[in-house]
Amino acid sequence: LIPKLAEAIGCPEDWLILELAHSSFYAGGEQVPGFPIVEVSWFDRTDEVRERVAEILRDTVMGEGYPLVQVIFTTLYQERFYEYEQE
């Protein structure tokens, strides 16, 4: 997955971080079966790149047997992004 995404985005593989968070889904006060929700936080890319990344994620998740997947993109802004690393 990482090599495909890095190629589509045009970035080094080590720029990409995946987080797997297990969730419970509820509707009408009852627990219901869930589905994968893939959230992508990134700096703005072209529509073509976004579409390609969505396709890669869709194909990967559905290839694992899930009939439904949501892919949600959130655009980050350079002037509002802070990253700190202790030396």
Model-derived regions: residue spans:
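Interaction-mediating elements
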Residues: L1-E87
